[in-house]
């Protein structure tokens, strides 16, 4: 089983300090933007509905399902936010709950420092350096390929859970060729984030198939988004192209949801974690295949959308 610990390694302390700095930077940028919106007469107090949306979507985000696709669907269904303001609202409102996820999982889930830093760095570099490459690729073809690959991986993991196929291990780190493989794949996943193709489910299945405990994926995938989202969110906040009430609702409802869901994930036995991987992977595969054949695509998460 994964070791949950509050004795922070030096690596974890540095990562947490950087995340706190990013949260402070984003919070200041958002506060300046919100004050300008209030002076312009835009209402700021979120309704109970908006807070409830934030709670539900961030709860499932913390479980690895993702928040942007469900939030987009709810916003459109209930007509809470105009379509043109949805990308900014998501990128602003979900930043601090995502940062909280990263802080919690890096603090309480012990992962080998070399593995954690290498995979965080590779995803981050992939999102920044790979953006110019993958944005020229056909998104529909990538979604189709990723969807089929995830379905195949979920079948293999389902067989493993049914003891019909060798199961993954419970390691908390990688070395040698396995680490190199993980870094390369995570770089590619980071690059694909710029197309709105999620990191969470592929990262969960990658870590599990390489013989690691699935819970080790949570600090990796949450940390990846935690380092990328504040920058994208700050840009949207500065532009003012977001709905203030809805964004505040995502924040207010999202924080307690993250705390509750993180406690559930931390306490899950390995057996149930492996079944969670199957559920998340199948969900992501269906979402990608549906997006590949739908006229409308899921709104990208400023380069960091999990699903």
Roles of regions detected by a PLM:
Residues 7-8, 105-113, 160-174, 209, ...:
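Membrane-interface helix termini and inter-helical loops of multi-pass transporters
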Residues 10-13, 137-150, 241-244, 268-276:
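Loop-to-transmembrane alpha-helix entry segments
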Residues 265-280, 303, 307:
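Membrane-interface module
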Residues 44-127, 179-262, 266, 279-282, ...:
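Small-residue-rich hydrophobic segments that form or flank transmembrane alpha-helices
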Residues 6-18:
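Feature marks short, highly hydrophobic, charge-poor N-terminal signal-anchor/signal peptide-like helices
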Residues 21-38, 100, 131-140, 148-170, ...:
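Transmembrane helix exit motif
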Residues 39-46, 163-186, 296-307:
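Alpha-helical multi-pass membrane helix bundles of inner-membrane/thylakoid proteins
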Residues 1-5:
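Short, Lys/Arg-enriched N-terminal segments with co-localized hydrophobic residues
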């Amino acid at each position: 089983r994964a070791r949950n610990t509050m004795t922070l390694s030096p690596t974890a302390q540095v990562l947490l300090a950087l995340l706190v700095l990013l949260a402070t930077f984003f919070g200041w940028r958002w506060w300046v933007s919100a004050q300008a919106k209030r002076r312009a007469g835009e209402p700021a107090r979120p309704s109970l509905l908006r807070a409830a949306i934030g709670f539900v979507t961030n709860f499932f985000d913390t479980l690895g399902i993702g928040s942007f696709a469900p939030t987009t669907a709810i916003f459109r269904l209930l007509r809470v936010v105009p379509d043109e303001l949805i990308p900014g609202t998501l990128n602003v409102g979900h930043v601090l709950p995502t940062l909280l996820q990263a802080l919690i999982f890096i603090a309480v889930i012990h992962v080998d420092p070399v593995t954690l830093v290498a995979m965080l760095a590779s995803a981050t570099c992939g999102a920044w350096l790979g953006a110019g490459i993958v944005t020229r690729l056909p998104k529909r073809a990538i979604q189709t390929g990723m969807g089929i690959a995830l379905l195949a991986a979920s079948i293999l993991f389902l067989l493993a859970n049914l003891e019909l196929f060798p199961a993954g291990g419970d390691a908390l780190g990688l070395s040698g060729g396995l680490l190199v493989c993980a870094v390369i794949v995570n770089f590619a996943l980071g690059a694909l984030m710029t197309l709105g193709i999620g990191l969470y489910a592929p990262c969960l299945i990658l870590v599990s198939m390489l013989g690691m405990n699935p819970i080790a994926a949570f600090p990796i995938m949450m940390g990846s988004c935690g380092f990328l989202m504040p920058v994208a969110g700050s840009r949207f906040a500065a532009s003012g192209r977001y709905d203030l009430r809805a964004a505040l609702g995502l924040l207010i409802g999202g924080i307690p949801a993250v705390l509750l869901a993180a406690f559930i994930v931390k306490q899950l036995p390995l057996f149930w974690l492996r079944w969670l991987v199957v559920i998340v992977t199948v969900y992501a595969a269906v979402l990608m295949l549906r997006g590949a054949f739908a006229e409308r695509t899921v709104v990208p998460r400023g380069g960091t959308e999990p699903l």
